Amino acid sequence: TLISPGVLARENDQSFIQNAPAEFGAAVIGPTVKGPVRVPTLVTSYSSYINIFGGAAESGSIDYGYLTNVAANNYFRQGGTTLLTTRVTHGSFSSAFTSGSTAGSGNSGILNTATSESFQLETISEGAIMNNYQAADSANGTLDSGSVDNVRWEISGVNTGSGTFSLIVRQGNDTATQKNILETFNNLSLDPFQDNYVEKAIGNQKNTLRTDSDGVVYLQTTGSYVNKSRYVRVKQVLRPTPQFFNNAGTPASSSAGIPFVDFIPVAGSGSFISGSGENFPSATSPAKFNENITNGNIQGLTATDYSSSISLLNNKDDYNFNVITMPGLTNNFAAHATQINSLVSLAENRQDCIAVIDVQAYGATVSAVTTQAATFDSSYAAAYWPWVQATDPSSGQIVWAPASAFIPGVYSFTDQSSEPWFAPAGMIRGALGNVIQAERKLTSSQRDTLYSANVNPIASFPGRGVVVFGQKTLQKRASALDRVNVRRLLIAVKSFISQIADNLVFEQN
């Protein structure tokens, strides 16, 4: 510090070590039993995935597991940490919500009196599967249509003196004596000026997929408060507490003392109604799963159902991942080819991920696989073959699944055990421990043919199991970038440099 006139020289050491760059995980696009529709959602464990997106799907009285589930389970079992999941559906879907003004044990409305609603909730998950309304609870407080995949609400701890209450989110198939509590929000208020206001405490934001006049797909967010519940959000507050009351329930002015009991909800439990959208619409019924997937039936979906989700994930500023897949689509089906090419283009445009694709359906020949692989030329895409057999974690059945459902897990294991620039292949890093067997036991000659066509073989070795035995990209020109580990090295380096350089964008040159 100078007191008399002079020149003060200062130094600022900027040679400090930056924080380690963030590492990103995988992305998967596909159908799930429940969850937000076409809203990319980050999950950090398989149990979290099941809570949000559900497990087995029932079609024709048989439980099936979506390939999305198989991919998620394998990814986390292989050491994956973050999975960006985008649920795809066929047709229009909407959330279920609370509504009704008639008191009763099975009432769907959250009432403050016998004939008036206090506020409304709606489920974050969309589809008719979230509906569980019935006129009255069955024995022991159960809901006939309550299931492991939907939820119910309960109001408790009502304090008419302070104007507070608790909201409990329960699993849809629990009972009055054995409640399965998913979330609890205590000390809630209907006073918009309080920190514990129900919309602030639970959240009221909703994401809707939009397409602007330029054809750009984006998510539009409505609502002022971030959702803190994984299952519900506040749809609207119908009877907010008048702002002239304080937290003690007494008038803050000379206004008439209207009691809190006229506004806050009464104790009780209820259900949700009016969710729309079927996982297996009549247009694609019965749904075709696993090796039975066809040109126009991909687990109850069509290929065009994937288009908007692919477009949305092109935005690298909003969504981060280093590998992306959509198991169930294979390039040999004409109706699937556009979406598979779009996925490859996504990876090329983003330049921060590899698209793992499947070029042939179950039961193909080596020559058919190489023919389909020849239609691609990109260092940002990789193909693996043949299909493999594994236990579906949601249905418990042994199923056939394409290689793309397992490769993100191999990449993740490589990242955890080594580094991204190590080859994600071989007896150790390429081991598919969750796989029972490969569709074909490839000979050395067949592996050579596949590798010459830039298809990575899934090989079987006695005593060693099933392993990924190749690491080529689909680039045709022979160069360093026709190897997966080199492409992943450059992706990692560019990502690290970009994250550090972002802090310097507006600094002086």
Which residue ranges define each predicted feature?
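Structured, hydrophobic secondary-structure cores that serve as assembly/anchoring elements
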Residues: 1-118, 158-166, 170-176, 193-197, ...
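Charged, amphipathic alpha-helical segments
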Residues: 4, 10-12, 55, 68, ...
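Conserved aromatic
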Residues: 43, 182-187
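Surface-exposed loop/edge segments in extracytoplasmic proteins
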Residues: 175-183
